[in-house]
Each structure stands twice: as structure tokens, then as C-alpha cells.
């Protein structure tokens, strides 16, 4: 009759729990009578896992003629500590795996990779290739740039030579994103097992292969941990709404400018805090894989990670000579120029759907459609955008390396007739023992001559 029905028994039962819940979820009062307002209430004790819990409610009065006798209710349980531990734990494994891979490959290659930087830096194009190769091997553009600053401070490289290597480092760092964009999580545990067993070898090269395989497994295992936790959070409406503040999806045909700047700023801050653009890219890929961000938002985020990674070189150059400071400045200017170029391309539409031309290009050369209602192969699109973005900036600036060096010298000039301080025993060269040893011998000779 449309009026509240009091004293009607309603039964509540737990239909499903969040996947992986270890503690038992339960209904406090399985059967409850409705009150004067026709409302039946009970409390649900959720498990320890973040995720969806489904509760069924059934009216136990078939003779009353209610139009609806049962209704399932979906509840989202949130374990803050569990989420933080899982995401940070996954990120830690990811970064450690990345470092282990780099260390393993360096063991296999010996000191040859680091000697490449000094040997091939004489030609701009070859210097870019050397920077790309070394960074792809050691899995860190920051480490390459810090090493370059060490070479400059020790008088082993000039500013013009170092700029080519820095350009290449930005391309080499995209290899990590390319690797993790493939769905190889099923190989993580076998790789960890096999890699660990191989590391037990007493032979350096074989042990290096073991570290490489073990690092590969840890990298994907950490990525899977982050992705799985973020996918569950993606079901939580309030959590998804938080990402709308920097959603860069076009409004009236244009990407919202403030949202784009906000996403780039978040990329900068995240990379500065983590001290690794590759790790920050891993988070971007995990967010995209969980459906929390789209292609429009991911690209400004990755542009921000490129700017944030320059902080490491800046810190390393504080105690170095003026030329090393100019190299750190070159790294920063290169990445800022790339960000400004990409910001401009965001507002150059192409095609009937007025998609930004760079995003349109990436979507055309990558399998799947990143702009579909349900984005396809989104992680691969983001990795390809990261790689081609850095390649494009290098192609634009490579013919102007000398002019770029002149700009750095104009911003941070060396006083006339002022000698450039050379530090033979440069601490940043310790990661390349053979070169550090040569510098030590050189320093001893200078001491003897003096």
C-alpha cells in the first residue's frame, strides 16, 4: 500500500568477498526486523583485503506480497595500511629489480659500457648512440648523467661531448618502459627462481646473467603487485573521482590547459621524490593498466617525469666545476624544451576527431585503439609515446649541440681567464673502476712532478 512495513524479518548473507581475503568476513546480525520506517539495518565485518564484498538481503515474508523480495548490495572495503604496503612494496621490488638488472648486465659487459662514454663522445651522433646504449644497460638516465658529470669534473670530457651523451641518455631510459609495457607477469616467479639459482655461480659472467634474470623477475613481480592493488582501487568511485582533478581528456575539442599542467607537475614531483623516472613511469603504466588514467592524462604525466629526473644531475653538480654545472643545466634545458614542445603539440589537432597530432601518430603506429570506449593496449601506447617523444626532441636539437653548449655557457658563464678546476680523484668515477684507477695514477704522477 506504499506505507512503511514494520516488524518484517529481513535476512542478510554474505554472497562474495574480496579476492585474497585471509580473515573471515561476516554479517553481525543475519536476521533483522524492520523498524517503524520500514528500514532493516545490520553491520558487516569485512576481511583484511581491499575490494568488493557483495551482501544479499531477502525479505522473509512471502505472504505479504512485496514486489521485491531480495536485493544484492555491493560494498567496497578499504584497507589503507594494506594498500600502502602493497603499492610501496611493489614499487620497492620494481626499483630493486631494475637496479639488479643493470648491475647484472654491467657484470656481463665489464667496464666496456662505461668506457664507451669516453671513447665515442667525440662525435655528436655517436655520442647520442653511446648515451642511449649505456643508459639502456644500466637502466638509469640519472646514473649516466651523474657519470658524465664525473668525467667532466675530472677533465675527461668537454661540454659539447657530454651534451650528446645526455641526449642519448633520455632515449635509453625509455627501454625500461618498453620492457614493462609487455604483459610478461607470468614469467616473474620462474625468472626469480631461475635467476637466483644462477647467481650462486662463482663465475662473474654467469652470476651476472643470474642477476639480470632475477632483476627481470623482480621488476615484473613488483609491477604486478602495484597493478593488482590499483585495479582493485579502480572499483572505488571516490578514488576514481580523485583522478578527475587532473584528467586531460578534451573538453570542447581541447585538452584542458590547467589539467595538463597539473598532470605534468605531478609527474615532476613524483620523479623528484622517487629519484627515478623509470620507477615513476612504472607507476604511470600501473595506473593506466588499472583504468584510473587514460592516454590523454598519461602523456603529460610522462612528460613531467622527464623534467623531474634532472634533479639528480643538479645535485651531483653542486660540488663540481663550472663546466659540470653547465652539463647539468644542459640536461635540464633539454628536458624543459621537450616538455614545452610537447605542450605545443597537445594543441595541434589532427583528423575529424581533432586528436592532438602526437597522440594520433602514436595511436596509428601502435596496435589497438587507445581512444576506444575501453582503451586497447594502453600500456604499449604510453611506452611508445615515451620513446618517440624523446627521440623527437633529440632529432630537433641534435644539429644544434654547439649552439646548445653556447646557450649553457651564456647562462652559466666561466669568468675570463679563470682556470676550470679539475678534480682528478672524482668520486662519481668510482662506478667505473678502470677509469678511476687511471685517474688515481694520473694524480700520483702530478704529485711526483710537483
Predicted regions, residues:
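Membrane-interfacial helix-loop connectors
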Residues: 135-140, 146-172, 178-187, 197-199, ...
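Membrane-interfacial helical/loop segments at transmembrane boundaries in membrane proteins
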Residues: 234-255, 351-378
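Alpha-helical transmembrane segments of multi-pass membrane proteins, especially transporters
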Residues: 111, 115, 119, 123, ...
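Hydrophobic core segments of alpha-helical transmembrane domains in multi-pass membrane transport
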Residues: 86-99, 131-135, 192-201, 215-226, ...
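Structural signal for the N-terminal portions of transmembrane helices
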Residues: 88, 213, 324-337, 362-403, ...
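The feature marks long extracellular or luminal low-complexity segments
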Residues: 1-79
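Helix-loop-helix hairpins and the membrane-proximal interhelical loops
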Residues: 76-124, 217-269
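Non-transmembrane accessory domains of multi-pass membrane transporters/channels
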Residues: 391, 398-450
Amino acid at each position: 500500500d506504499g506505507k512503511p512495513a514494520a516488524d518484517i524479518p529481513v535476512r542478510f548473507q554474505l554472497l562474495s568477498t574480496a579476492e585474497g581475503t585471509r580473515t573471515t568476513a561476516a554479517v553481525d546480525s543475519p536476521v533483522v526486523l524492520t523498524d517503524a520506517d520500514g528500514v532493516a539495518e545490520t553491520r558487516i565485518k569485512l576481511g583484511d583485503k581491499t575490494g568488493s564484498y557483495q551482501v544479499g538481503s531477502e525479505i522473509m515474508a512471502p505472504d505479504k506480497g512485496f514486489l521485491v523480495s531480495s536485493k544484492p548490495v555491493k560494498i567496497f572495503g578499504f584497507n589503507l595500511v594494506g594498500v600502502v604496503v602493497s603499492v610501496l612494496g611493489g614499487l620497492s621490488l620494481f626499483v630493486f629489480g631494475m637496479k639488479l638488472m643493470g648491475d647484472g648486465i654491467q657484470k656481463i659487459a665489464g667496464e666496456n659500457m662505461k668506457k664507451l662514454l669516453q671513447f665515442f663522445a667525440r662525435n655528436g651522433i655517436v655520442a647520442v648512440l653511446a648515451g642511449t646504449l649505456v643508459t639502456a644497460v644500466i637502466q638509469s638516465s640519472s646514473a649516466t648523467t651523474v657519470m658524465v658529470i664525473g668525467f667532466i669534473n675530472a677533465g675527461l670530457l668537454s661540454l659539447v661531448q657530454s651534451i650528446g651523451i645526455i641526449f642519448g641518455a633520455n632515449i635509453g631510459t625509455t627501454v625500461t618502459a618498453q620492457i614493462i609495457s609487455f604483459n610478461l607477469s607470468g614469467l616473474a616467479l620462474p625468472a626469480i627462481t631461475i635467476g637466483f639459482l644462477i647467481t650462486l655461480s662463482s663465475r662473474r659472467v654467469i652470476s651476472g646473467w643470474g642477476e639480470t634474470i632475477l632483476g627481470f623477475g623482480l621488476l615484473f613481480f613488483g609491477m604486478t603487485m602495484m597493478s593488482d592493488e590499483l585495479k582493485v582501487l579502480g572499483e572505488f568511485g571516490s578514488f576514481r573521482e580523485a583522478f578527475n582533478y587532473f584528467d586531460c581528456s578534451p573538453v570542447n575539442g581541447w585538452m584542458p590547459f590547467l589539467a595538463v599542467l597539473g598532470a605534468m607537475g605531478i609527474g615532476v614531483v613524483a620523479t623528484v621524490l622517487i629519484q627515478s623516472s623509470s620507477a615513476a613511469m612504472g607507476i604511470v603504466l600501473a595506473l593506466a593498466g588499472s583504468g584510473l588514467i587514460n592516454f590523454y592524462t598519461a602523456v603529460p604525466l610522462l612528460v613531467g617525469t622527464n623534467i623531474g629526473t634532472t634533479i639528480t644531475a643538479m645535485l651531483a653538480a653542486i660540488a663540481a666545476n663550472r663546466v659540470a654545472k653547465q652539463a647539468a643545466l644542459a640536461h635540464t634545458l633539454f628536458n624543459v624544451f621537450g616538455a614545452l614542445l610537447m605542450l605545443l603539440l597537445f594543441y595541434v589537432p589532427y583528423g575529424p576527431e581533432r586528436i592532438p597530432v602526437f597522440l594520433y601518430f602514436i595511436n596509428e603506429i601502435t596496435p589497438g585503439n587507445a581512444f576506444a570506449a575501453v582503451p586497447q593496449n594502453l600500456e604499449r601506447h604510453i611506452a611508445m609515446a615515451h620513446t618517440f617523444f624523446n627521440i623527437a626532441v633529440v632529432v630537433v636539437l641534435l644539429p644544434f649541440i654547439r649552439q646548445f653548449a653556447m646557450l649553457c655557457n651564456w647562462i652559466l658563464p666561466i669568468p675570463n681567464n679563470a682556470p676550470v678546476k679539475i678534480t682528478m680523484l672524482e668520486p662519481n668515477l668510482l662506478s667505473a673502476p678502470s677509469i678511476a684507477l687511471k685517474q688515481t695514477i694520473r694524480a700520483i704522477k702530478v704529485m711526483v712532478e710537483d
